[in-house]
Every structure is written in structure tokens, then in C-alpha cells.
């Protein structure tokens, strides 16, 4: 169970008007019903590492957490120290590995990780749906790392217990504004902005929310 949470932790994730740190977001998660976070990178590329940072922070706070990599990139595998050739979603989909064998542990933290191992999987595929359902039963929180250029696949990942996090590693808010604008064009307005530790700047704000 979660533990050692400050009494003044925010009651819910601060949506929209402020960029939060991973620690602030974790404190908020303890008091919310959110069980899944969809992570998008504000840097314009795929496979931002915000999900790795957040997963480690969640695990340190005493919650069980798993990161599902749907980017089809190798950055998350490299950052978490998972050996090349380790099985992932591709092997699971091809019946080459059972679910238990595609779940790996972050070598630098306590978060578990499932890799894409191949082309980026479709979020609404039966295999991804099965993995997400199993993880929802087994973990306090599931993080889904998604390529920001595949926002059209977001609806299949969203429900009343899912939040969208735009994680930034850039030194300016331009990336936040770009991703947020694209999401709003799809009718998605309820966003959380998280600044990754490597480039955190005090007082930086997220783009204004529409009235």
C-alpha cells in the first residue's frame, strides 16, 4: 500500500494550468482513482523518457507500477537496462512468449516494463487490450508510453480511470503547446503537464487552457 505521503499532498493531479514534477504527480495519484496514465512526449519525437521517470517515482512511493512501451523505439529499453533481444509485445502477439515472460524489471528501479519489441503495436489490438486488462488487475498504476504522432489511437486507451500526461524534456514550453494543441483539436482538454527532472525549470507554466 502507498506510504509516507505528505499530509499536504494535492487532492488530485493539477490539470492544465501548471507544470508538475513527477513527485507532485505521484502524491496526487495516491488520492485519486486514476489507474492508468498515457504518456506523450512534448519534445516532438517518439519514446520520451517521462514514463520511465514517473514509473520509478511511483514505485519509490510504494505503489506497484508497470510501464507499457507502445512507441516501437529502443530508448525505454536502453534506459531501463533491459537486455537486447528480451521478449515483448511482439513475441506475445506471435505466441512466442507468455505474459509472464514479457514483463521485465527496470534495472535502476522497481517499476516493471513491457517492451514493444518491433514496430509500434496498435493500442486497440486484442493483444495490447489483453495485456492492459491483466496489468490493471495486478498493478496499482499502468503507464502507457505512446508516440505523440499516434494521437488518433488515444480513444482506445481512455476510460474514467485514465489520465493523459504530456511530459516535457525541452527547455521551452513550445513542445507542450504543440502537443496540447493537437490533443485539443481531437476534443481532449483534460491534460496533466509534467516536466522531467533533467530539464526542470522553476516557475514554468503550461500553455493556457481554453475558456
Residues covered by each model-derived region:
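P-loop/Walker-type NTP enzyme "switch/lid" segment
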Residues: 6-16, 27-49, 66-140, 148
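A generic structural signal for alpha->beta connector loops
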Residues: 62-64, 110, 187-191
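Conserved catalytic-core segment of NTP-binding enzymes
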Residues: 124-211
Amino acid at each position: 500500500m502507498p506510504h509516507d505521503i505528505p499530509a499536504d499532498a494535492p487532492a488530485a493531479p493539477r490539470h492544465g494550468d501548471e507544470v508538475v514534477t513527477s513527485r507532485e504527480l505521484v502524491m496526487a495519484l495516491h488520492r485519486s482513482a486514476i489507474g492508468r496514465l498515457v504518456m506523450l512526449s512534448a519534445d516532438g519525437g517518439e519514446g520520451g523518457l517521462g514514463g520511465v521517470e514517473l514509473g520509478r517515482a511511483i514505485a519509490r512511493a510504494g505503489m506497484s507500477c508497470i510501464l507499457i512501451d507502445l512507441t516501437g523505439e529502443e530508448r525505454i529499453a536502453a534506459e531501463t537496462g533491459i537486455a537486447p533481444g528480451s521478449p515483448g509485445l511482439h513475441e506475445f502477439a506471435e505466441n512466442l512468449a507468455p505474459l509472464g515472460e514479457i514483463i521485465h524489471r527496470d534495472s535502476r528501479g522497481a517499476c516493471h516494463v513491457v517492451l514493444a519489441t518491433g514496430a509500434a503495436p496498435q493500442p486497440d489490438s486484442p493483444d495490447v487490450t489483453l495485456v492492459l486488462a491483466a496489468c490493471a488487475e495486478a498493478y496499482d498504476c499502468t503507464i502507457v508510453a505512446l508516440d505523440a504522432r499516434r494521437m488518433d489511437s488515444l480513444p482506445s486507451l481512455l476510460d474514467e480511470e485514465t489520465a493523459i500526461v504530456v511530459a516535457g524534456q525541452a527547455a521551452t514550453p513550445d513542445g507542450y503547446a504543440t502537443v496540447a494543441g493537437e490533443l485539443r483539436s481531437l476534443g481532449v482538454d483534460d491534460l496533466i503537464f509534467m516536466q522531467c527532472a533533467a530539464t526542470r525549470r522553476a516557475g514554468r507554466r503550461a500553455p493556457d487552457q481554453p475558456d
